[in-house]
C-alpha cells in the first residue's frame, strides 16, 4: 500500500468496521464519553449523511466493552471499567416504508434477533409487550441495565410524507411500540434516539418526559460533522494532497473547502461544522463536487415551498423562533424548520433579545444544488436546461457581449411552457432571482436583497454589469432608476468599465421585451 494512501469512511457507518479497516477517523470519543456518562436519555437531530449512524455505532461498541477499538483515542484514557452491557440497536433506515406491513416486519425482525439471545414468552403477543419483556429479561440475565439505541426513528414517517393516512398509521405503530420505555427506567442504563425531525414534531415519544434534546446545545454541537480545528489538525495531509491535485496552494485549498462544505451551525454559539460526507468524498476524488446534494433530491421540500407560497429569495437569510422548530409536522405552516433539519438551511446568527435565529444556506454546495433543484420546479423545464443557459450567459459576458446574453435570456423565457402564462410578477421575479443566483456560483454576482440596490450586479474581469428589471414598464424607466438611485456609484472607483442595463419584462409575451444599455468608460473620482 502506498505510504500516503488514506482510506476514507465513505459508506461505512459501523465503528468496528471503520477501525478494523484503518479508515480515517476524526476522534469524537471524548464527546461520546461525556454523552454516555452525563445523563441517560437523549435525542439528537441532524441532517442525513451527517454521521448519526456512525455515532450510534460508536456508542454501541463502547457499551459492549470493545476496548481494543478505542486504542489511541480519547476514550482509551477516559474509560476505566469497560462494562459489557446488553445493547439493543434498531436502525429504521435499513428499508423503505410504503405500507404498514413494512414497519411491522422491521420491528418483528429486530425483536426476533434480540429474542434469540434473551428468549421470549408466549404471553407476549404485541411488539410492545415483546420489547418490554426482552428488556426485563436482558436485565435479569446479565445483572446490568440495558442500552437502547434507536437510529433514524423518523425514517418511516419521512418515507410517507406524500401519504398522510399511511404516515398516521406508521406514527401510531411506532408510538405503541415505544410506549413501554417510559415505565422501564429501572432497567435502562442509556437510551439514545436519532433522527432528522425533532421528536416533538412527530408525537412518538411524548410520554418520555425525561428525554433530553441535545440537537441545539452548544456542548454537543460538534458531536457529528467536522470542525475547522479538527480539519486543520487531523486532516492536514488530506488538504495538502487536495491542493497538489488541483494545482493550488494549501491556503487556497482550505478556502475552497470552507466555501464549498463548511458553514453548518447547530446551536447559538456553535463553531463552524463541515459536512463529513462531502469532505471525505472530496478528499477521495480530489475534486470540489456537490457530493452531499447529489445523493438526494429534496422533492418534498420543493413541493412544500410551493404549497406554502414561500418566497425562496428569503432563503439567503430568514428568521425563525424555537416555537417554529417544535411545531408538529401535521401543523407546519412554514417550510423553514423542515429546511433547517434537513440540512438545506443552518444557523447563521442568534438575537438573544428577541430569541430569534437567523438561518441561511450553509455553503456553496447546498446553495447551488438547491437552486438547481428549484429552477425546474418554477420553470417546468429539465434542470440541465437552466444550467446550460447559465453557462452560456457567462460565456457571453466573458466576451463582453451583453447583447447576446440578453437575446439568450429572451429565448430562455420564451421556452418556458405556456401553462405558466397566468403566473404573477412574483413568480417571474423568483425565476430571475434563481437564474442569476445560480450564475453567482460561477462568477461574482449579487442579487437584490434590500431596497436601494440594483436588481442584479455581475462582476466580470473587465466590466461590472448593473441590471434593473421592470415588469410591464419600459426599459428606459429601468435605466432611469439605475441613474436616479445611484446604483452604479459604489462601483465607479473599481476601475472596471460599468455597463448599466435597463430591461423590461413583457407579461403578454412572458419574456424580455426590450432593453437599453448605457456604458460608463471613465472612473468617477467623486
Predicted regions: what is each one?
Residues 1-424, 439:
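Phosphate-binding site recognition
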Residues 147, 463-465, 499:
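Structural motif
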Residues 167-172, 471-488:
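Mg2+/Mn2+-dependent nuclease catalytic core
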Residues 432, 454-471, 485:
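Conserved catalytic cores of phosphodiester-cleaving nucleases, focusing on short active-site segments
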Residues 433-449:
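A short acidic/basic microdomain associated with nuclease active sites
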Residues 444-450, 456-460, 491:
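C-terminal amphipathic alpha-helical interaction region
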Residues 490, 494-526:
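Domain-level recognition of nuclease-like catalytic cores that cleave nucleotide substrates
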Amino acid at each position: 500500500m502506498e505510504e500516503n494512501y488514506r482510506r476514507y469512511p465513505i459508506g461505512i457507518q459501523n465503528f468496528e468496521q471503520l477501525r478494523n479497516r484503518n479508515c480515517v477517523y476524526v476522534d469524537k470519543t471524548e464527546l461520546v464519553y461525556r454523552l454516555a456518562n452525563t445523563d441517560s436519555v437523549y435525542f439528537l437531530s441532524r441532517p442525513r449523511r451527517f454521521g448519526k449512524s456512525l455515532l450510534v455505532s460508536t456508542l454501541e461498541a463502547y457499551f459492549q466493552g470493545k476496548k481494543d477499538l478505542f486504542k489511541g483515542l480519547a476514550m482509551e484514557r477516559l474509560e476505566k471499567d469497560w462494562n459489557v452491557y446488553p445493547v439493543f440497536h434498531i436502525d429504521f433506515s435499513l428499508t423503505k416504508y410504503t405500507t404498514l406491513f413494512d414497519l411491522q416486519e422491521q420491528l418483528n425482525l429486530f425483536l426476533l434477533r434480540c429474542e434469540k439471545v434473551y428468549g421470549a414468552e408466549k404471553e407476549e403477543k404485541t411488539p410492545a409487550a415483546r420489547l418490554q419483556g426482552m428488556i426485563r429479561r436482558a436485565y435479569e440475565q446479565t445483572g446490568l441495565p440495558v442500552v437502547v439505541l434507536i437510529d433514524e426513528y423518523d425514517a418511516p414517517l419521512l418515507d410517507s410524507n406524500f401519504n398522510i393516512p399511511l404516515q398516521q398509521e406508521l406514527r401510531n405503530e411506532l408510538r405503541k411500540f415505544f410506549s413501554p420505555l417510559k415505565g422501564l427506567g429501572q432497567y435502562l442504563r442509556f437510551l439514545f434516539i436519532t433522527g432528522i425531525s425533532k421528536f416533538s414534531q412527530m408525537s412518538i415519544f411524548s410520554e418520555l418526559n425525561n428525554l433530553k434534546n441535545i440537537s441545539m446545545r452548544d456542548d454537543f454541537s460538534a458531536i457529528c460533522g467536522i470542525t475547522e480545528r479538527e480539519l486543520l489538525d487531523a486532516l492536514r495531509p488530506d488538504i495538502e494532497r487536495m491542493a497538489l491535485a488541483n494545482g493550488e496552494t494549501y491556503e487556497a485549498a482550505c478556502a475552497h473547502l470552507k466555501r464549498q462544505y463548511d458553514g453548518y451551525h447547530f446551536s447559538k454559539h456553535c463553531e463552524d461544522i463541515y459536512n463529513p460526507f462531502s469532505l471525505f468524498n472530496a478528499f477521495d476524488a480530489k475534486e470540489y463536487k456537490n457530493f452531499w446534494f447529489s445523493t438526494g433530491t429534496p422533492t418534498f421540500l420543493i413541493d412544500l415551498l410551493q404549497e406554502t407560497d414561500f418566497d425562496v429569495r428569503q432563503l439567503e437569510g430568514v428568521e425563525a423562533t424555537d416555537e417554529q422548530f417544535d411545531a408538529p409536522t401535521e401543523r407546519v405552516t412554514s417550510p423553514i424548520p423542515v429546511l433547517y433539519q434537513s440540512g438545506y438551511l443552518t444557523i447563521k446568527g442568534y438575537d438573544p433579545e428577541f430569541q430569534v435565529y437567523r438561518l441561511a444556506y450553509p455553503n456553496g454546495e447546498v446553495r447551488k444544488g438547491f437552486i438547481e433543484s428549484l429552477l425546474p420546479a418554477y420553470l417546468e423545464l429539465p434542470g440541465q436546461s437552466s444550467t446550460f443557459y447559465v453557462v452560456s450567459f457567462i460565456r457571453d459576458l466573458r466576451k463582453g457581449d451583453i447583447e447576446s446574453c440578453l437575446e439568450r435570456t429572451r429565448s430562455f423565457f420564451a421556452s418556458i411552457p405556456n401553462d405558466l402564462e397566468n403566473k404573477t410578477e412574483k413568480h417571474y421575479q423568483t425565476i430571475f432571482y434563481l437564474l442569476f443566483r445560480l450564475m453567482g456560483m460561477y462568477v461574482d454576482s449579487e442579487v437584490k436583497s434590500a431596497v436601494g440596490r440594483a436588481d442584479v450586479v455581475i462582476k466580470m474581469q473587465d466590466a461590472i454589469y448593473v441590471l434593473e428589471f421592470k415588469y410591464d414598464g419600459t426599459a428606459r424607466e429601468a435605466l432611469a432608476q439605475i441613474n436616479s438611485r445611484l446604483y452604479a456609484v459604489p462601483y465607479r472607483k473599481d476601475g472596471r468599465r460599468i455597463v448599466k442595463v435597463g430591461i423590461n419584462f413583457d407579461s403578454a409575451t412572458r419574456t424580455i421585451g426590450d432593453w437599453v444599455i448605457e456604458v460608463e468608460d471613465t472612473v468617477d473620482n467623486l
